[in-house]
A protein has these predicted regions:
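An acidic, glycine-/histidine-flanked metal-binding catalytic module
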Residues: 2-47, 168-238
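Short, flexible, solvent-exposed loop/turn segments with mixed acidic/basic and small polar residues
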Residues: 93-105
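A short, structural micro-pattern
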Residues: 104-106, 147-151, 167-171
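Residue(s) in the substrate-gating loop at a strand-loop-helix junction
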Residues: 112
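Helix N-cap motif at beta-to-alpha junctions
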Residues: 115-119
Length: 238
């Protein structure tokens, strides 16, 4: 069954990366053959499925050694979300959006949720020591939380980067590592976005400052509870 799933997921990219990049530019500028550009982006998205399955399996083996009850999920970013990301303003609300779709590292992504701080750090360390043909770089939002208060560890895997040639060489897959409380925080942000019509996650600089401050403070208290930071009694009773 697993082998059948792998074979079904082997969707080969039918276009060059340059064609994909130009399709993204066409969509962002809303100039040119939009329908054809969307078709190209859709196929590029689908081609991420096989490398996503490979990376998910790699990460899952490490997670199971840390906690057999760890939760893992994978997804391909929805096409409307990719298009929105190409067209919307940047997160700082100032610089123009010039992102190339071929540089989006989260079209294919998986998330691992572990119990606590220790398990998170052990899993990250285990992945660091992993011998693999895939290169990875780390974005540590534990040491450097986002301005919104988001915390977690992201690992960007460039698939088969150490191989001379491979059909899926160079595809990026993002892996998010979170504790249960960090995941609860992130899920709550998404729920507020949905129910209140906010954009705390995607465009925080255009969102209600009160919500932003609320979630930033909540993140600080959660980080203190889990041992990532220390808040003095004075800071807790601001």
């Amino acid at each position: 069954m697993a082998n059948a799933q792998y074979e079904k997921g082997k969707i080969i990219l039918e276009y060059s990366k340059n064609q994909v990049k130009k399709a993204g530019e066409c969509i962002r500028k809303e100039n040119g053959d939009i329908d054809k550009s969307i078709e190209i982006i859709q196929q590029y998205r689908a081609a991420h499925l096989y490398p996503l399955m490979i990376i998910k399996n790699l990460v899952w083996k490490h997670a199971q050694k840390i906690n057999k009850n760890a939760i893992i999920a994978r997804r391909l970013k929805r096409l409307p979300t990719i298009i929105d990301k190409l067209r919307r303003k940047t997160l700082d609300g100032k610089t123009p959006n010039s992102i190339a779709v071929t540089r989006m590292s989260d079209i294919g992504g998986c998330r691992v949720i572990v119990e606590n701080r220790l398990e998170l750090l052990l899993l990250d360390s285990s992945l660091d020591k992993s011998r693999t043909t895939h290169n990875s770089k780390v974005k540590d939002y534990i040491k450097n939380p986002k301005q919104t208060g988001y915390r977690g560890i992201h690992r960007i895997y460039t698939c088969y980067d150490k191989d001379e040639a491979h059909q899926w060489k160079g595809f990026d897959i993002e892996v998010q590592l979170r504790t249960k409380l960090q995941h609860l925080w992130a899920t709550t942000v998404e729920v507020v976005d949905l129910c209140e019509g906010r954009s705390l996650k995607t465009n925080p600089f255009e969102s209600n400052p009160s919500w932003i401050e609320f979630f930033r403070l909540m993140s600080e208290f959660i980080a203190d509870e889990e041992g990532f930071v220390y808040l003095s009694p004075h800071e807790k009773n601001f």
